[in-house]
Amino acid sequence: MRTKNSKIINSEQDIFRNKVIPIKFLSNYNNEILKKPQWMKIKFPVSTNKIKNLTLILRQHNLNTVCEQALCPNLAECFNRGTATFMILGSICTRRCPFCAVSHGKPSLVNKNEPQQLARVIFDMKINYVVITSVVRDDLKDRGAQHFSNCIQEIRNKNNVKIEILVPDFRGMMRESCKIISMNPPNVFNHNLENVPRLYKLIRPGASYIRSLKLLEFFKKLNPNVPTKSGLILGLGETYKEIVHVINDLLDHGVTILTIGQYLQPSSKHFPVQKYITPDEFKKIKNYALSIGFKKVFCGPLIRSSYHAEKYFE
């Protein structure tokens, strides 16, 4: 059953509200650091030469990756394979989510040369599948949609690659932003719901569960041949019943690719892990999602939204 649309608050008021939101934890949540189970142990590659080389290339071209900014647990593996998820529009987010490691505050000016720089690096690295994401830019009139479109166009002008974009919610400009991106549509359109609606005020201040669903649905309506994708991170206090509800909502709004992974606390200043989901629990969730009609489901402790993203086309 679809959820009714919600009222969108004035964007300038939203921006101010996000600047003053304190990260605080409620007394009915576990604030203790849970011991990591064995299945969360990460194996690092023996050689780090490829990691160093890729990092050097990124710095030379003044490019950011969400792998680094969000402290992704798969960074070593992906960098060692020569892959990365590029983060455009700077490294400073205009929102402050207590589960996220990306820096927040007053963002920098948009680098107009970034699309060309990005296309050049992708060409030099001989990448066949690229994932592009961004920080939230509530300060920009179009929320960064035109910059996404410019990046896609520049990459296609220079490279024969498949492009996946992982976008923010374009608050207050959702329809306009989707139309802009539809001028240069990606091969896959991704927007993460992150978690269940009950926890949104706590972990996603400034975001709206309904708005995110509407974004995915509207883009699919404009681009029926482009697969839409979304992801969740678990271990924030959600229940299995709530997870199932979100999975149903995503399918009902046209999403066919799903990623689900374990939340990891970036630092002691971030929201603490409430539970480590077991591999068997992840398997149960994956089987449910596949049983109701999802085409691809990547579900496991270390899964992230862009992890092995190219496998959708295999």
From Swiss-Prot:
Any one of the GO CC terms: cytoplasm
Which GO terms of the molecular function aspect are on file?
A: 4 iron, 4 sulfur cluster binding; lipoate synthase activity; metal ion binding
Where found? Cytoplasm
Residues recorded as binding [4Fe-4S] cluster 1, renumbered to this chain, are C67, C72, C78, S306
Q: Which cofactor does it need?
A: [4Fe-4S] cluster
**Keyword annotations from UniProtKB, A to Z:** 4Fe-4S, Cytoplasm, Iron, Iron-sulfur, Metal-binding, S-adenosyl-L-methionine, Transferase
E.C. numbers? 2.8.1.8
Kindly state which reaction or reactions the protein catalyses. Answer: [[Fe-S] cluster scaffold protein carrying a second [4Fe-4S](2+) cluster] + N(6)-octanoyl-L-lysyl-[protein] + 2 oxidized [2Fe-2S]-[ferredoxin] + 2 S-adenosyl-L-methionine + 4 H(+) = [[Fe-S] cluster scaffold protein] + N(6)-[(R)-dihydrolipoyl]-L-lysyl-[protein] + 4 Fe(3+) + 2 hydrogen sulfide + 2 5'-deoxyadenosine + 2 L-methionine + 2 reduced [2Fe-2S]-[ferredoxin]
Chain coiled-coil ranges: none
Per UniProt, the enzyme's principal EC class comes to transferase
The family database entries (Pfam families) matched by this protein are listed as: Radical_SAM
| Family, per entry | Belongs to the radical SAM superfamily. Lipoyl synthase family.
**Protein name listed in UniProt:** Lipoyl synthase
This chain's source organism reads Buchnera aphidicola subsp. Baizongia pistaciae (strain Bp)
